[in-house]
């Protein structure tokens, strides 16, 4: 599969000049663009999938990861800007949902849709005791306690975990330091996606994303925990395709904060 991109921050595994829309996928903390690789054929040819690629992982492994969520979002928005010549949506998972939200606020064009997966809304993220500063063994124990979707084979591979450690630590630091700032509501519909048994994004917190958009906001739940999306991918792909290839409903009354 050939990757074409004008920026290291956005991978375009399959460029589709005739696509009706684009989907920008933002991975979870510590994750790379390959976590969304199976979405590329799943949405073609109607939707071109663009993968957000943060430094410090996969082919950018030798680059220093960033520990500032707003700075990350600014880089993502800058890389997206040349690709907004047709309807587009963002889909972020876990910390990626917060990055996607912050990037959407900076874009020169409004998204057609935002999909927020496995994340409480940014204004209601509960502060947890910080762990990013802990010694390696303690930090990784906390990561393993939090994440239910990383295979044992990965945890048990000391060399692989050593490669992943800097980006994991930077992402946890970015999330721990992030504080939401009141902003204009997103001018587009938002679909919130969650796992019914996700302890990191409790079901009761998800509907509060509605306060961050002037459009319609709906919440959809799936069986599973924090990485429910691995099994629910086909259903969510259908939702994305429908949202990007059918006319959007009229905006609802503004529900913004601030």
Regions found by a protein language model. Give the residues of each.
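Domain-scale detector for complete catalytic domains at protein termini or as standalone homologs
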Residues: 1-91, 95-258
């Amino acid at each position: 599969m050939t990757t074409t991109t004008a920026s290291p921050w956005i991978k375009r595994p399959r460029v589709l000049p005739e696509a009706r829309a684009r989907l920008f996928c933002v991975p979870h903390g510590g994750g790379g663009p390959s976590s969304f690789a199976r979405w590329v054929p799943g949405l073609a040819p109607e939707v071109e999938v663009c993968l957000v690629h943060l430094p410090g992982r996969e082919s950018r492994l030798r680059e220093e990861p960033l520990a500032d969520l707003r700075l990350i979002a600014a880089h993502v928005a800058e890389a997206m800007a040349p690709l907004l010549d047709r309807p587009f949506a963002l889909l972020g998972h876990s910390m990626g949902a917060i990055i996607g939200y912050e990037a959407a606020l900076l874009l020169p064009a409004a998204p057609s849709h935002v999909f927020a997966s496995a994340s409480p809304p940014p204004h209601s993220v509960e502060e947890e005791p910080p762990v990013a500063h802990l010694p390696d063994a303690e930090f990784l124990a906390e990561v393993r306690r939090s994440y239910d979707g990383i295979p044992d084979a990965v945890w048990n591979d000391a060399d692989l975990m050593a490669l992943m450690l800097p980006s994991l630590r930077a992402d946890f630091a970015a999330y721990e330091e992030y504080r939401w700032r009141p902003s204009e509501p997103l001018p587009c519909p938002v679909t919130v996606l969650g796992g019914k048994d996700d302890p990191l994004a409790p079901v009761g917190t998800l509907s509060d994303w509605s306060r961050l958009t002037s459009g319609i906001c709906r919440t959809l739940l799936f069986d599973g925990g924090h990485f429910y999306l691995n099994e629910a991918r086909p259903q969510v792909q259908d939702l994305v395709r429908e949202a990007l290839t059918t006319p959007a409903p009229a905006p609802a009354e503004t529900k913004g904060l601030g």
